[in-house]
A protein has these predicted regions:
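Intrinsically disordered, low-complexity serine/threonine-rich segments
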Residues: 12, 18, 31, 45-49
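A short, exposed loop/beta-hairpin motif centered on an aromatic-Gly-Thr core
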Residues: 23-38
Length: 57
């Protein structure tokens, strides 16, 4: 999982390699007005709700 703060907007971009039913891809989400901790938790919750597995590595 990669977490970046965008300088000009203050947004937080969370990206991770995810897997669903044998297919893997890079999933990214942009969070405005979130703390890094809250953005990371929201990303994890979204992946869990969609039954995506976040790949470790």
């Amino acid at each position: 999982m990669t977490i970046e703060r965008v300088q000009h907007s203050g947004a937080i971009v969370v990206s991770a390699l995810v897997e669903w039913e044998g297919v893997k891809w890079l999933e990214s989400a942009t969070y405005y007005g979130y703390t890094i901790k809250a953005a990371k938790a929201s990303f994890r919750d979204s992946c869990k709700r969609l039954n995506y597995t976040i790949e470790r590595g």
